[in-house]
């Protein structure tokens, strides 16, 4: 069925200044969707986490078009994950010479794209099965 092994193109964002749980809320909405559908969802999403994820999806698509010469209409998100990063530690000055520690969470986001055109294009059921498996 396959012409060759379908390569995975990825974009990795590290040390993004937000909680991993807040980023996962957005990532769960786009996992397994096509590239164009993902852009529409992220542009209309009201969360602060949507913007850095949108930049990563753009970056992964430009990586795919540069390395594989693939069309953006054939791309879909095969894997999207969010991992915790190191906490940025600061001290906030308080009254009477005291200070309180502030821990600002960070996260690492990975977006993997696959190109559907690497599979047989004559059977549309293969493409639909790929999209269903990725979800």
UniProtKB/Swiss-Prot annotation:
GO BP annotation list: translation
InterPro entries reported in the protein's UniProt record: Ribosomal_uL22 (IPR001063), Ribosomal_uL22_bac/chlpt-type (IPR005727), Ribosomal_uL22_bac/org-type (IPR047867), Ribosomal_uL22_CS (IPR018260), Ribosomal_uL22_sf (IPR036394)
PROSITE patterns assigned to the protein according to its UniProt record, in alphabetical order: RIBOSOMAL_L22
Annotated disulfide bonds: none
Keyword set includes rRNA-binding: yes
CDD domains: Ribosomal_L22
Annotated signal peptide: none
Keyword Ribonucleoprotein listed: yes
Gene Ontology CC: one annotated term: plastid
Localization per Swiss-Prot or TrEMBL: Plastid
Molecular function via GO: rRNA binding; structural constituent of ribosome
Keyword list, A-Z: Plastid, Ribonucleoprotein, Ribosomal protein, RNA-binding, rRNA-binding
UniProt main location, coarse: plastid
Family designation: Belongs to the universal ribosomal protein uL22 family.
Role of this protein: This protein binds specifically to 23S rRNA.
PANTHER family attached to this UniProt entry: CHLOROPLAST 50S RIBOSOMAL PROTEIN L22-RELATED, LARGE RIBOSOMAL SUBUNIT PROTEIN UL22M
Self-association and partners: Part of the 50S ribosomal subunit.
Protein name as catalogued: Large ribosomal subunit protein uL22c
Organism: Cuscuta reflexa
